[in-house]
Amino acid sequence: TKLNTLTPNSQKIIGQMDGKLKMTTYVNLLDKYFWVGLPARVNEDLKLFEQYVRFKPDMEMEYVYYYDTPSVPAYQEEGNLTMEEQAKKMMKINDLNPKMFLTPEQIKAKIDLSGEHNRLVRELEYNGKKTFLRIFDDNMIFPTEAEISAALWTSLKSVSCRDMANVQ
């Protein structure tokens, strides 16, 4: 049905992508939205993008787990725990393997997420061009098709999202 497919404009954007599209989700264990990318929830998270994968089956998706100072903490800790102690506590509470998490130093060596306030964020990469796809502090939290397609269009054309109306 029409509800289960992408709009014609989104299909055009995906159709113009003849190279590899990679989406990396950076999950900060100490961010309030860390739960979105937890391993137990990855399949549910991937459903957000299943319509895109249908049109771009070679789309690569990766999850990178780390801990660092968040803009909005996952919880307010009483006491004076260090960031590492907070991370270890969250790993224990959520039954997560500590080996899967990069330290603040390790994540910073890989990518600078300070401009994203160390929040859960997705990075779309296409033909060497990268753009971020964010989650939101509203009732919906997750990006809609329009926002996902705008980010893809930005990766494809390296233009502002305002130009998306000019999809050819």
Set out the residue ranges of the language-model regions.
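Short, surface-exposed patches at the edges or C-terminal ends of soluble domains, predominantly
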Residues: 1-168
